[in-house]
Swiss-Prot record, chain A:
GO terms for molecular function: protein-macromolecule adaptor activity. Pfam families: Adaptin_binding. The keyword Chloroplast does not apply. Involved in gross chromosomal rearrangements (GCRs) and telomere healing. It comes from Vanderwaltozyma polyspora (strain ATCC 22028 / DSM 70294 / BCRC 21397 / CBS 2163 / NBRC 10782 / NRRL Y-8283 / UCD 57-17) (Kluyveromyces polysporus). The lineage of its organism: Eukaryota, Fungi, Dikarya, Ascomycota, Saccharomycotina. Belongs to the IRC6 family. Keywords: Chromosomal rearrangement. This is Increased recombination centers protein 6. GO terms for biological process: vesicle-mediated transport. It comes from the Eukaryota. InterPro entries: Irc6.
Length: 250, 156
């Protein structure tokens, strides 16, 4: 909860601690969260007071940045009851690590499944930094039943490639990939609080606005405006009318 | 002839974004169908068949980007391929209405998506209107009436 009483959401992002971490941090924080290195200290562990904006809403959130040496250990810590409070306040988790297709794959899948199962109604993204895994393999992994371990709770991990080797913008399902997909997942996650921004409503193509009716209504509005004595009230009325007409004419 | 039993829209994250039931079922039965279908449909791979036998009926689904459109159909009456066309027409109509529709558009304008669906399918699940142009005209008329109503409210 913020000082003004509004709810502040939290996203946890965890990087594997290696010599690439500075580059990874910069690109993920820049591409996904639009955090410019010039304006934000990427070395901070908690970046507060950020705003996530879409064409429909704006919401405030804090970004928790973490690193790990051993994913298994980090995962087990986060699953443990000691971290119940932290998990409770999170809107979602993004893990940036290399996905392994070799013998320890099952353990990695198992860990992802375990973590996903304790993240009810929160998004969970695993960003794979392993260049050898193609987009088609990632799609298959995501389709694979073993990755949908937590579908009962309406939650599952989604693996997304960090590197866009093929330079594609969409996968075989016409779904966004890479950073854009991470943004899409965050866009549609369940935030707390937030407010809707004034939007231009979607509307079917049409040019046949009844102008006569618009003018009649304008006349009517002007007469009513002139009748209002209180200046503030008049201004308020004028503002409401202009908004309504703008929407009507779009 | 179509007699769709239900139409569900499920996201890749397993969230139900739209649900329309054309048969009367108790709530717990609906929840069970949604839960089972979510795990069945999400786990199917790209090259698998889009028609699945499910309990006493068939399910036809199609994936568009990160959204799965799932229809339960009456086996004796419905044609599976026609159902796929109904789904596609619904998606095309939403795409034209919203202009490259995405999940967020549906979340924040779900009533418009339901309006389009209601124009296409009658309350018994049969096809009422197949023309995209006609459906968009109807929805546009509803939008105009809604805006007029807002204006009237401000002016009154």
């Amino acid at each position: 909860m913020n000082e003004d009483g509004s709810v502040c959401n939290k996203i946890l992002i965890a990087f594997q601690d290696n010599d690439q971490i500075a580059n990874l941090k910069e690109s993920v924080l820049g591409e996904v969260f639009r955090l410019d290195k010039a304006n934000t200290n990427h070395d901070e562990n908690i970046i507060k007071g950020l705003t996530w904006s879409t064409k429909y809403y704006e919401v405030r959130y804090d970004l928790y940045v973490d690193t790990f040496d051993d994913f298994e250990e980090w995962c087990k810590d986060l699953i443990s009851s000691e971290y119940d409070d932290l998990r409770e306040v999170l809107s979602g988790i993004i893990v940036i690590d290399s996905y392994t297709m070799e013998k320890d794959k099952i353990d990695q899948n198992k860990l992802l499944g375990q973590l996903g199962s304790v993240l009810q109604d929160k998004f969970f993204v695993f960003m794979n930094t392993n260049k050898d895994i193609s987009q088609d393999v990632i799609d298959e992994l995501n389709d694979d039943n073993s990755m949908q371990l937590t579908s009962d709770s309406g939650n599952s991990v989604e693996i997304i490639n960090y590197h866009n080797v093929s330079n594609l913008k969409l996968n075989q399902y016409n779904e966004k990939i890479g950073f854009e997909r991470v943004r899409e997942i965050i866009d549609t996650c369940e935030w707390s609080g937030g407010h809707r921004v004034q939007t231009v409503e979607a509307k079917a193509d049409s040019t046949d606005v009844d102008l006569e009716s618009v003018f009649n209504r304008l006349k009517e509005a002007r007469l009513k405006y002139l009748e209002i004595e209180d200046e503030d009230e008049r201004e308020q009325f004028a503002l409401e009318i202009s908004n309504e007409f703008a929407e009507f004419l779009q | 002839m179509t007699q769709i039993k239900y139409m569900l829209l499920i996201s890749r994250q397993g969230k139900v974004r739209l649900q329309k039931w054309y048969v009367s079922l108790p709530n717990n039965e609906k929840t069970k169908i949604i839960r089972n279908l979510t795990s069945i449909v999400l786990s199917r791979k790209a090259k698998m068949c889009n028609i699945v036998e499910f309990g006493d009926h068939k399910v036809v689904y199609k994936r568009y980007a990160s959204l799965y459109f799932v229809c339960g159909i009456t086996q004796e009456v419905d044609n599976e391929l026609l159902t796929l066309e109904v789904i596609h027409r619904f998606v095309e109509t939403m795409d034209t209405y919203f202009g490259n529709v995405c999940e967020l558009d549906i979340i924040f304008n779900f009533e418009k998506a339901y309006n389009i669906l209601d124009d296409m399918l009658m309350c018994d699940g049969s096809l009422a209107e197949s023309s995209k142009k006609e459906i968009l005209n109807h929805v546009k008329t509803m939008d105009t009436m809604e805006h007029n109503d807002h204006l009237d409210r401000v002016l009154s």
